[in-house]
Amino acid sequence: MKISRKTTLLAGFLLGLILPLAAQVRTTREEYIDRYKSIAIAQMERYGIPASITLAQGILESDCGNSLLSMRSNNHFGIKCKRDWTGEKVYHDDDAKGECFRAYPTVEASYHDHAEFLDKQPRYDSLFAYASDDYKSWARGLKAAGYATAPDYAQRLIRIIEESQLFLLDRPDGEALYARRYGLPRDPEEWFSSQTSV
């Protein structure tokens, strides 16, 4: 089957129009948080993993759901296959070329598996000694346990949490606090001290 030059030019022209539009439809951090905060809170209530940590990892690992890996596989946490994984797989270049990553039918399944992964892997056991509102210890503990290879992984998580005030979600009334966060102190230390003085 021979493809005409006109067809090729038309296809190229259409791709030239569509691709820039698709690139502009990126999920923002705020949209990502609004979309997944309830799931992160539910995982915190079930497993004790701070919602702020879960969301910050999802934001960082998936680029707010915009990364190729997250779009192809719904994997928002960069969890690799390893030997015990029996689910769907996708191959993606990361630290090495063509690494095996877990694939999920939905983003919600990725969030659930992330909590199960941390809960069941012995190397993360020490994290569960931290309170579910101690996001700094959780961030440092994830890095120390080898969750990511980036040397500044803990600092990046903490920065995301503090910039977006995700620490509010770790509180018992977190969703309500987060909804009215614009009137609250941005600095976590200032916010926590204002709560204890009431």
Please place each PLM-identified region on the residue numbering:
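Bacterial N-terminal signal peptides
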Residues: 11-20
